[in-house]
């Protein structure tokens, strides 16, 4: 039997406000336990929450970027459950009237575009954290994280493969960091993913029973967890078993998911409007102000890069994986006048070297100005591709310009026709067998002769000119 995968994803986006959603306590990461928990987070009697308006602005910003409806009246609700890191006994969230509804996000899988529906994005507070490793036989509670503002972004179950799920979360990650509403630090919990997975026989309309994989904090873990869960569900069904709705956790050490608890539905949390918080009213003027402050969005910039610089849609998507990378590319492309070459070097050598060194484009040791200098010398045939890589290595490890490195190391490409002709004639005279083979129709023999010329020139001869002159001499 053939199976179809159905995936929906909930992402908890931690907003980068200086203070918490309902108090003035700091949201800074890494402080000593319980040093950043105010009376609101501690749930002391008589203390009332006060909404941080910056949270609302950031939520509107995301809603606009998702081309979603911004609800002009939205309501906070209490989500009731007991857990030691939640002193109030409820979490302040949104249920029936969230701030953002009915959005969409375009993804690219290979060369195929797809639009994923975004059901809603709602504001809520984060819970505290349980500490198990610091106490023998006991657990500690750290409430520093409690009250940190979150946007929970809920997708439609529109994804049909792990590749689509990865493309969606990466596109959302790019968007929230691009908009400046989230710092994107996944190690610190700024972007946490819950993945709902089900399978059904191909052609069946009804969804299968889903299981939710909780708290994934890396794209690699999402890929591993989803692949394992899909295969587990298929194996269970093909063996005659039933998939029970449940919440599961992913164990990176074993690469497997394991049962956490049977899955609750919304009614289990007994949502009701929070009586301590008035409904949030959003005016047209507020939305217009935020819209006017929005940067050019990744999708629009991708289309512009394709039109203005002639890069492929795939390259444009890579170049806009972050705002900093997009700005770096555009600076190089404008300075050098070579959009395609700039894209090739940034998506190729620059990306590989940054990945090797564990760096981000913001930490790139080659400035846009210095890279554009290298690209200009490739474009005007001063450098061959081989020599360009030598110059690139020197650029990475120094602060010199491409021209200074070329001058210092004598790396200028030889394009003088007379000089190349002399080397070609010497190669032809020294390799009569290769000449005979080429004239007999063996194209590879020409490459062997070209290699001899390049060797004689110490890699500095213009490869295209070498090939042209060889063909002229041997025709």
UniProtKB/Swiss-Prot annotation:
It is an enzyme of class 6 (ligase). One of its GO terms (molecular function) is ATP binding. Heterotrimer of A, B and C subunits. Belongs to the GatB/GatE family. GatB subfamily. HAMAP family: GatB. Allows the formation of correctly charged Asn-tRNA(Asn) or Gln-tRNA(Gln) through the transamidation of misacylated Asp-tRNA(Asn) or Glu-tRNA(Gln) in organisms which lack either or both of asparaginyl-tRNA or glutaminyl-tRNA synthetases. The reaction takes place in the presence of glutamine and ATP through an activated phospho-Asp-tRNA(Asn) or phospho-Glu-tRNA(Gln). This is Aspartyl/glutamyl-tRNA(Asn/Gln) amidotransferase subunit B.
